[in-house]
């Protein structure tokens, strides 16, 4: 991607920048940046906000020197074109240093050590979800190299961040994060993001197997979908953007995303921002954990690897899961106080998926609202005051329908954003009027191609019981039942 007008390029940064950086003014104050983040309902890319961060120099080579031979866990995946997602439960893992990773990634024939069994032409490696507090436990000063306070979150730095280092082809399967929203700073190399709005959830065929708290996975390999098995995916609205060094991507709450490294080495830093809705989400996640662990351990108490994501150390007992659930409900009540406030919040969260007009469109609780085709006067005013421009570019829907061929997918590269008439910035207004209808449609379409129309597996049952729409309703019933 070409450098944007007035931007400090990666080459400028590498050469020091000097006086030019000192003169450069960030396009948004911390207060304005936070306002945008807390109000924006679609993904967008920030420009010219991190040119003075020390972390902009954190290449994999630099980090290998900082870590001094520290062992890191890498996820090893195959460079395949399968139609099935490559979940983390299907990957192998190696413990290696960044020096070993860089040597292997350079395709040296004399490679040995942890990567010796993995042909670089057939495998990719990904050091993902590396929390700074563990990775740099003896170098805490480095936390200050990441300055999320520039986005309006005082005191937030590397301590609340994770690091991602990958080779060409490394990716995360399509999923949504149940908690918060996400800021992603691209440091080295480029990553391609495939994003889908929350209201497209029925078309992404959500599943909680493999189980990981805070992640809802899609059954679909979105870059090579099996449309015969998952025909509803044709209705999903793909948004694509290639994130380059020096850019920061904002991922709103509950947006699905599949992320792939498209350069030989990529380095990213992200931070999940807590939101008000997380209080109820904790109840939903506790319900999910209890049901998944109960059914899957009953099915096969000795084989957790097949269903428990490697990020989860072990399955938790029913007693512990009951403790989690009661703790989440207690925390919800402690936060909201009176029973009237609690019930109002529960009802409000329920309506966010069905009645758009009853909620403030310019707030995070409105991310997944339904709505008609007529724009209110308030909506028009908001679009007229759109924050988008040269330094904040929206990620808009792709120009073509998803294809099973990778070459058939087009993307928004962040350069050619639309004009401020509001017609192309917002999400297309399409949403089921009832959350139950969305659940039924997803479940029905998921059974279109099955070996047997009558056999129901434990996973089939769980796909219904812990469908995000179902656990949301159950959580609301639990909360409302205790608010009287």
UniProtKB/Swiss-Prot annotation:
The UniProt keyword set, sorted, is: Cytoplasm, Stress response
Provide a GO CC annotation, any one.
cytoplasm
Q: Which residues form the JmjC domain?
A: 124-288
Q: Where is this region: Interaction with HSPB1?
A: 88-208
Nucleotide-binding found in the keyword field: no
As one GO molecular function, the record gives: 2-oxoglutarate-dependent dioxygenase activity
Transmembrane intervals: none
Chain positions covered by the region annotation Disordered: 1-26, 396-429
Where can this protein be found? Cytoplasm
A family per Pfam: Cupin_8
Query: What does the UniProt function comment say about this protein?
Result: May play a role in cellular stress response.
Assembly information from the UniProt record: Interacts with CRYAB and HSPB1.
Q: What is this protein called?
A: HSPB1-associated protein 1
């Amino acid at each position: 991607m070409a450098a944007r007008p007035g931007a400090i390029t990666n080459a400028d940064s590498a050469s020091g920048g000097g006086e030019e950086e000192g003169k450069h003014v960030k396009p948004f104050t911390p207060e304005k940046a936070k306002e945008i983040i807390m109000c924006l309902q679609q993904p967008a890319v920030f420009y010219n906000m991190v040119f003075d961060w020390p972390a902009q120099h954190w290449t994999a080579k630099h980090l290998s020197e900082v870590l001094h031979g520290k062992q890191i866990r890498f996820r090893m995946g195959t460079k395949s074109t399968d139609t099935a997602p490559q979940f983390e439960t299907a990957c192998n893992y190696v413990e290696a240093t960044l020096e070993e990773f860089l040597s292997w990634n350079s395709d040296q024939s004399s490679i040995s050590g942890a990567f010796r069994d993995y042909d670089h032409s057939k495998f990719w490696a990904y050091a993902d979800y590396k929390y700074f507090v563990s990775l740099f436990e003896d170098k805490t000063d480095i936390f200050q190299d990441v300055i999320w306070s520039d986005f309006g979150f005082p005191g937030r730095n590397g301590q609340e961040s994770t690091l991602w280092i990958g080779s060409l082809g490394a990716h995360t399967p399509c999923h949504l994060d149940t908690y918060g929203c996400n800021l992603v700073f691209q440091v080295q190399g480029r990553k391609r993001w495939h994003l889908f709005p929350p209201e497209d959830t029925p078309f992404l065929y959500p599943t909680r197997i493999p189980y990981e708290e805070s992640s809802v996975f899609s059954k679909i390999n979105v870059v090579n979908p099996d449309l015969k098995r998952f025909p509803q995916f044709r209705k999903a609205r793909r948004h694509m953007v290639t994130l380059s060094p020096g850019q920061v991507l904002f991922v709103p709450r509950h947006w699905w995303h599949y992320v792939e490294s498209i350069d030989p080495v990529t380095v990213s830093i992200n931070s999940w921002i807590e939101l008000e809705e997380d209080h109820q989400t904790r109840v939903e996640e506790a319900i999910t954990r209890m049901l998944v662990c109960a059914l899957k351990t009953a099915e096969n108490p000795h084989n957790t690897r097949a269903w428990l994501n490697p990020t989860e150390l072990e399955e938790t007992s029913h007693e512990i899961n009951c403790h989690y659930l009661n703790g989440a409900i207690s925390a919800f009540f402690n936060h909201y106080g009176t029973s009237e406030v609690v019930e109002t919040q529960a009802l409000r969260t329920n309506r966010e998926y069905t009645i758009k007009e009853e909620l403030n469109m310019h707030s995070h609780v409105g991310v997944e609202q339904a709505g008609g085709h007529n724009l209110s006067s308030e909506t028009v005013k908001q679009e007229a005051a759109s924050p988008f421009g040269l330094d904040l570019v929206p990620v808009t829907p792709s120009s073509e329908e998803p294809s099973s061929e990778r070459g058939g997918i087009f993307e928004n590269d962040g350069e050619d954003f639309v004009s401020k008439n509001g017609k192309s910035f917002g999400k297309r207004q399409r949403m089921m009027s009832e959350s139950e209808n969305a659940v039924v449609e997803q479940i029905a379409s998921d059974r279109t191609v099955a070996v047997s129309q009558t056999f129901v597996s434990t996973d089939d049952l769980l796909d219904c019981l812990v469908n995000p729409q179902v656990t949301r309703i159950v959580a609301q019933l639990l909360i409302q039942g205790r608010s009287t």
